[in-house]
């Protein structure tokens, strides 16, 4: 079992349409039933499943010597972020100059996507992408691939290795 200590912030309800319809925009942080905030909290994880969430002063008695304990005191622990729209093969073209969309696509995006025909290049580019996503707290993605599907198997393999939640499909441009 692994315990993570830190400041914990999470929402208490699954984001279903029914739950979201009941939230009044200005009331989200006024209604403490909507979220959990623990200044000195602990999350316990066993076999990849969160089994414990609570105040450290209460939970510390449950932590055994053989358990892993990670102290993130003064750090914020939140659920992973979700990137709901990303083009997985365009990492190297992000912020590339382009006067108009077609100019940008033709001069930067389409040429950079050619690299994904090589599994070696795809691994390198996807490695850069995933490092940036994880570094910024993103753990789930909805990714668009080029119409050729080049590198798709590589991205599935890498994201599976990290147990990342992924929805992928190709883009016809």
Task: Describe the residue ranges of each PLM region.
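Flexible loop residues that form catalytic
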Residues: 7, 11, 87, 146
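Hydrophobic faces of well-ordered beta-strands that scaffold small-molecule active sites
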Residues: 80-84, 141-143, 166-170
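Gly/Ser/Thr-rich helix-start
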Residues: 55, 81, 138
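Structural motif
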Residues: 1, 68, 139-140, 165-167
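Alpha-helical scaffold segments that flank or form the walls of functional sites
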Residues: 95-164
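N-terminal metal-binding scaffold of metallo-dependent hydrolase/deaminase domains
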Residues: 1-63
